[in-house]
A protein has these predicted regions:
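Active-site acidic short loop of glycosyltransferases
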Residues: 69-72, 102, 128-129, 146
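Conserved redox-active cysteine motifs that mediate thiol-disulfide chemistry
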Residues: 78-95
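A short beta-strand-turn-helix
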Residues: 45-48, 53-74
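N-terminal targeting signals for export/organelle localization
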Residues: 1-53, 174, 188
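Thiol-based oxidoreductase modules, predominantly thioredoxin-like and allied folds used
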Residues: 104-116, 128-137
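Hydrophobic beta-strand core positions in alpha/beta domains
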Residues: 75-77, 109, 153-154
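Short pre-active-site segment immediately N-terminal to redox-active cysteine/selenocysteine motifs
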Residues: 72-74, 78-82, 148
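Thiol/disulfide oxidoreductase modules built on the thioredoxin-like
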Residues: 121-129, 135-185
């Protein structure tokens, strides 16, 4: 083999290695992430839309501001006590939360129900300790275009919605955990 052919093959070899290594990012990541979204039936929000800011009351009557969630990955779940599928997925949301450090990842539930005592009893009965915020005027629900319950939105540390699911999911599944980890790693 002459020098020119050897040089060409060497160049192709190194180019191939760089493509395979992806300069530190595996080639399968994009496909694997798409598979996670698809497996969970979570619609990807293409551009990562910034969320609208909000101030809502929690079960204790204290105001919680969306900016307090900055720096965390957030799974925002819209639900109601009259919604059977919402109540059915609540334990899986709690199990998902238990797998992550709450300073990095937070499941936050938002309801239009206006009966804090009933919600407290419901959550205590199930042994669930998740934050509940009240959307009295449904302004936040409208800003997230909630058309059916449950609706869940996945939000990055910098406040951008990257995924949306309508209907119940098994939020403690391997795919859900992997998706949250992926977002925690900065959607690399």
């Amino acid at each position: 083999m002459d020098r020119r052919a050897r040089g060409l093959l060497t160049g192709l070899f190194f180019t191939g290695c760089l493509l395979i290594l992806g300069l530190g990012v595996p080639l399968h990541d994009a496909a694997a992430v798409s598979d996670l979204f698809a497996a969970l039936r979570v619609t990807r929000v293409a551009t990562g839309s910034p969320i609208a800011s909000f101030d809502l009351k929690n079960l204790e009557g204290e105001t919680v501001r969306s900016m307090e969630l900055a720096g965390k990955v957030v799974l925002l779940n819209f639900w109601a006590t009259w919604c059977g599928p919402c109540k059915g997925e609540m334990p899986s949301l709690a199990r998902l939360q238990s797998q992550f450090d709450p300073t990095q990842f937070q499941v936050v539930t938002i309801t239009t129900d206006m009966h804090p005592q009933g919600i407290k009893q419901f959550l205590q009965h199930l042994g669930i300790d998740l934050p509940v915020l009240f959307d009295e005027r449904e302004d936040v629900s409208r800003s997230f275009m909630v058309r059916g319950l449950p609706t869940t939105v996945l939000i990055t540390q910098d406040g951008r919605a990257v995924g949306r699911a309508v209907g119940p999911r098994a939020w403690d599944s391997e795919e859900s955990v992997a998706l949250v980890r992926h977002v925690l790693e900065g959607m690399k």
